[in-house]
Amino acid sequence: MESSCKSWLLCSILVLVAFSLVSASEDEERLVRDLFRGYNKLIRPVQNMTQKVGVRFGLAFVQLINVNEKNQVMKSNVWLRLVWYDYQLQWDEADYGGIGVLRLPPDKVWKPDIVLFNNADGNYEVRYKSNVLIYPTGEVLWVPPAIYQSSCTIDVTYFPFDQQTCIMKFGSWTFNGDQVSLALYNNKNFVDLSDYWKSGTWDIIEVPAYLNVYEGDSNHPTETDITFYIIIRRKTLFYTVNLILPTVLISFLCVLVFYLPAEAGEKVTLGISILLSLVVFLLLVSKILPPTSLVLPLIAKYLLFTFIMNTVSILVTVIIINWNFRGPRTHRMPMYIRSIFLHYLPAFLFMKRPRKTRLRWMMEMPGMSMPAHPHPSYGSPAELPKHISAIGGKQSKMEVMELSDLHHPNCKINRKVNSGGELGLGDGCRRESESSDSILLSPEASKATEAVEFIAEHLRNEDLYIQTREDWKYVAMVIDRLQLYIFFIVTTAGTVGILMDAPHIFEYVDQDRIIEIYRGK
């Protein structure tokens, strides 16, 4: 008995639910039939043709999909919000089972032809036509989602630390302001960010909205439109890591060209390699940015600055290498170069010149003395005058040579005969001899002295050649060091001056706070 009661109660509930659903469906069907009896969706919903249809329009920004800098197009996902009144779509809820809203396809009713004026892909209408919501008061709400590609003028002045202002301009395509009057949705003069998804490339800074009314005259009707400004700032981490830092490091590699020794053949090779890498970065930037001639991007300024500095460094390096390999046979060093680069600049640059390369016999021989046995046949120096007097008439076979001529350029011999008739040796090495006494030398000895003089002259010339070469090398070293300091200072100043010129480079954007502000308004 109890189970049969429960079954009867359940069946009763199901019947009541089914009846209510059928009743509600019948009420909605009857309402739609009554509302659209004689309704013409092609005519503006006004009772008098002089009246305006007031349309409240708003925009909800859902996602910033992409900003194509080269084509100057912003792709965004938005929700449109349109509200207007249609006096033909009013009813009394009590007459139709308390129905408070109707959801119908948009093709059933009249709707304003609001389009995006600055559309960039040719599709001016929304693709997905969602249902319209009709309320008993005649208010019609339409919230279609749309993906727009709008034209956006890109200002590349401070790229990649740039801030862009993209606009989305909406208005009626065929109706003027005297027929369809636009107003801001719920008087919100901003874009709604309640459902916004944060972008990984851009931060939203501000999203104001403005209603523009262009007053007409007798010849031109009034026009209205609503313009939404999407002010965005680029997140710079990607470009800083992939573009800015490599460019800065490459620019300072130009300085290291002057740290290589001039004898190294890799100085010019390094400079040309850096030049080629800069060309690659210039081509990369040209593919990213629009081909505009109005302004020069910040990164292009820096690349151009680095390119010029590297070109100048290659030219200076060629000059340094040329000076490094100069010698006395091809060039003579002017006095002003010797004074500036060998005396003043090294002291100014805190450079200490290496010791000059001198021949060992010029460095270590303070004086020169006759050997104990100048010639094996002459015996001791005391016996030399006796030997000379003994040979007497054979002087024609001997050549006379002053002892003052038997000297080395840095070790001059001073010989004289003492009162005892012996040939004495002076203590010092001087060019001028204190005595003009002479001795007789055999032809073999004369040839030997000539050979010694030839060797001494050759050594003197070789030493002069080496010293001149070393002077030119040191001049090249001084220029290298000077250019190292100059290029480091100029490169540092140029890097700071160009990159720090961006106005928002150090500003932090709290995206969550901005979204919360425009969500709570």
From Swiss-Prot:
Residues 1-24 form the signal peptide. GO terms for cellular component: acetylcholine-gated channel complex; neuron projection; plasma membrane; postsynaptic membrane; synapse. GO terms for biological process: chemical synaptic transmission; monoatomic ion transmembrane transport; regulation of membrane potential; synaptic transmission, cholinergic. Pfam families: Neur_chan_LBD (PF02931), Neur_chan_memb (PF02932). Disulfide bonds join 152-166. Its main location: membrane. Residues 324-481 are cytoplasmic. The chain crosses the membrane at residues 236-260, 268-286, 302-323, 482-500. Residues 25-235 are extracellular. Keywords: Cell membrane, Disulfide bond, Glycoprotein, Ion channel, Ion transport, Ligand-gated ion channel, Membrane, Postsynaptic cell membrane, Receptor, Signal, Synapse, Transmembrane, Transmembrane helix, Transport. After binding acetylcholine, the AChR responds by an extensive change in conformation that affects all subunits and leads to opening of an ion-conducting channel across the plasma membrane. Belongs to the ligand-gated ion channel (TC 1.A.9) family. Acetylcholine receptor (TC 1.A.9.1) subfamily. This is Acetylcholine receptor subunit beta-like 1. It comes from Drosophila melanogaster (Fruit fly).
